[in-house]
Curated annotation (Swiss-Prot):
It comes from the Bacteria. CDD domains: ATP-synt_Fo_a_6. It is a multi-pass membrane protein. This is ATP synthase subunit a. The chain crosses the membrane at residues 28-48, 84-104, 130-150, 192-212, 220-240. Its main location: membrane. It is found in: Cell membrane.
Amino acid sequence: MTETILSGGQIEVGEHHTTTWFGMTVNTDTVLSTAIAAAIVIALAFFLRTKVNSTGVPCGMQLFWEAITVQMRTQIESAIGMRIAPFVLPLAVTIFVFILISNWLSVLPLQYTNADGHTTEVLSSAAADINYVLALAFFVFVCYHLAGIWRRGIVGHPVAVLKGHVAFLAPINLVEEITKPISLSLRLFGNIFAGGILVTLIALFPPYIMWAPNAIWKSFDLFVGAIQAFIFSILTILYFSQAMEVEDHHD
């Protein structure tokens, strides 16, 4: 009998490096990726602020982010109106940049081998951790409901959410509203997590051919990370639009 070994490695999916802070279990790899992404966003904001205030020729990075800001502004103008909700623009752009950088960190070829001989990414995508995406989605959930209360009133907003466009569908509208942060987070988590699974499977290829599919997928991963960041920010704008909609109001 001939035995064929298809894989001598071990596939580890969804594993995180954990530690205990103040009695709570913390995924340190997610915290590290999130902190680095936040630091890059803040540094990028100060850099672009300096460029905007200067009188020199705009650099390529400035033009790139200006194009993103214009795109977000157009979406907000058509969905809500900049005069009604100007605060949504910096929020949407910040969320886009933050998620984009978080996703792109995993593309960096930084790996190490642990004591068990398993090769692990130093900077994994924070969006591959369900805690990260749920926290981000619930933050958006709270923000657009606060905006809805500011726009419609503390009584008018809950009534409008339950009533929706068809009053007798109030129970369904309530379930839909509760599931919004779940669907928003799982959409991002599923795509990024699936990418991590594929990279893990590619790592099982023989070393002499592994570089080719890995390079192709890493390139595609840049595109997927950008698309998912854009979708998350666009849905954020859409949820703000729904929460701040007022009947028979003309701007």
